[in-house]
């Protein structure tokens, strides 16, 4: 009797003990790599299918290289090539790919398409990004925080900007890893009803507000993201609403003296963050970028039941 595949779709789907095991494996694999111990190939002979409906440099390279470092291989498929959901049904695509590959990563705007793919796949499916959430990114962020500042449990993270997929996964992480999350957004760009309802039901230590200074005060880390994503309309209007939410030296000064600055990149310098902050000593954005690969290696190994 075959067991159900171990998907990685959202942080709240995975028990805290399992998320911690993934991070521990990710840290160990990174350490071995830095020490030149590269003989371990736990995914030797395994193939990852990467499906991209939304373009990405970091997601593609980090999954591709990470899979190769684990001894496997990766193939890339684009939405244009696959006509995902427009030609063959998503369910049939999931069934067919499951016969060819060992694991699937999909980066697609529609979260419903992700869950439908996972429902019909007989191999693990990883959420590489949807409009609703970005769990791989926030696993890398938690890994990065703990590299620099130790356990994140009980610490305070401030989010300043708008409601988006990265914020949602930070909220899920606050619940799973037991840290405080202060959120500051313009009233017009506040967290959506689905996320607010989830926050309310989760009991997580999350404060929603509109004042970036209040959110940042005493924080251990300040996080932001680009104000206008691909496909967003009314970019100029959003930009005007978000100007007061820029992360600059003044805002960073309200956080703890050793507070970190995080951004998942690419950054629009001069908009959501100043050069002074993103290039400054508190910024760990390039560590985050590197840790995308290491965290995803941990996720790949976990999904496939392989030792990291």
UniProtKB/Swiss-Prot annotation:
Part of which pathway? Amino-acid biosynthesis; L-arginine biosynthesis; L-arginine from L-ornithine and carbamoyl phosphate: step 1/3
Q: Where located? A: Cytoplasm
Q: Which residues bind carbamoyl phosphate?
A: 56-59, 83, 107, 134-137, 264-265, 292
Pfam name, any one: OTCace
Could you name the Gene Ontology cellular component terms for this entry? Answer: cytoplasm
Biological process GO annotation list?
A: arginine biosynthetic process via ornithine; citrulline biosynthetic process; L-arginine biosynthetic process
Q: From the Swiss-Prot or TrEMBL record, what is one GO molecular function term?
A: amino acid binding
Question: Which reactions fall under this protein's catalytic activity?
Answer: carbamoyl phosphate + L-ornithine = L-citrulline + phosphate + H(+)
- Its primary localisation, in coarse terms, equals cytoplasm
Which UniProt keyword terms apply here? Amino-acid biosynthesis, Arginine biosynthesis, Cytoplasm, Transferase
The cross-references to PROSITE patterns, in alphabetical order and at most eight, read:
CARBAMOYLTRANSFERASE (PS00097)
| UniProt binding sites for L-ornithine | 165, 225, 229-230
Q: Report the SUPFAM superfamilies cross-referenced here.
A: Aspartate/ornithine carbamoyltransferase (SSF53671)
- State the InterPro entries in the record: Asp/Orn_carbamoyltranf_P-bd (IPR006132), Asp/Orn_carbamoylTrfase (IPR006130), Asp/Orn_carbamoylTrfase_sf (IPR036901), Asp_carbamoyltransf_Asp/Orn-bd (IPR006131), Orn/put_carbamltrans (IPR002292), OTCase_ArgI (IPR024904)
The UniProt record lists the EC number as: 2.1.3.3
PANTHER family in the record: ORNITHINE CARBAMOYLTRANSFERASE, MITOCHONDRIAL, ORNITHINE TRANSCARBAMYLASE, MITOCHONDRIAL
State the protein's purpose: Reversibly catalyzes the transfer of the carbamoyl group from carbamoyl phosphate (CP) to the N(epsilon) atom of ornithine (ORN) to produce L-citrulline.
Sequence similarity:
Belongs to the aspartate/ornithine carbamoyltransferase superfamily. OTCase family.
UniProt-recorded name of the protein: Ornithine carbamoyltransferase
Where does this protein come from, organism-wise? Nitrobacter hamburgensis (strain DSM 10229 / NCIMB 13809 / X14)
Q: What is the lineage of its organism?
A: Bacteria, Pseudomonadati, Pseudomonadota, Alphaproteobacteria, Hyphomicrobiales
């Amino acid at each position: 009797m075959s067991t159900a595949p171990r998907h990685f779709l959202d942080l709240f789907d995975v028990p805290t003990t399992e998320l911690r095991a993934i991070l521990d494996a990710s840290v160990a694999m990174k350490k071995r790599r830095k020490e030149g111990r590269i003989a371990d190939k736990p995914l030797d002979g395994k193939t990852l299918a990467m499906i991209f409906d939304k373009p990405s440099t970091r997601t593609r390279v980090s999954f591709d290289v990470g899979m190769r470092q684990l001894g496997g291989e990766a193939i890339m498929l684009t939405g244009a090539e696959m006509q995902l959901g427009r030609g063959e049904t998503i369910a049939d695509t999931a069934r067919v790919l499951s016969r060819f590959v060992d694991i699937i990563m999909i980066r697609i705007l529609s979260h419903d398409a992700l869950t439908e793919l996972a429902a019909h796949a007989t191999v693990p499916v990883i959420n590489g990004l949807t409009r609703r959430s970005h769990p791989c990114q926030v696993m890398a962020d938690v890994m990065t925080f703990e590299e620099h500042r130790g356990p994140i449990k009980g610490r305070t993270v401030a989010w300043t900007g708008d409601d988006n997929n990265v914020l949602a996964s930070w909220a899920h992480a606050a619940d799973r890893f037991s840290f405080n999350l202060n959120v500051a957004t313009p009233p017009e760009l506040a967290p959506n009803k689905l996320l607010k309802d989830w926050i309310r039901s989760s009991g997580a230590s999350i404060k929603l507000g509109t004042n970036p200074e209040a959110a940042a005060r005493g924080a251990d880390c300040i996080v932001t993201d680009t104000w206008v994503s691909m496909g967003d309309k009314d970019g100029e209007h959003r930009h005007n609403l978000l100007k007061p939410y820029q992360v600059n030296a003044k805002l960073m000064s309200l956080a703890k003296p050793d507070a970190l600055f995080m951004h998942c990149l690419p950054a629009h310098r001069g908009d959501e963050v100043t050069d002074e902050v993103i290039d400054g000593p508190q910024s760990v954005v390039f560590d985050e970028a590197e840790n995308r690969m290491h965290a995803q290696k941990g996720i790949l190994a976990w999904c496939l039941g392989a030792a990291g």
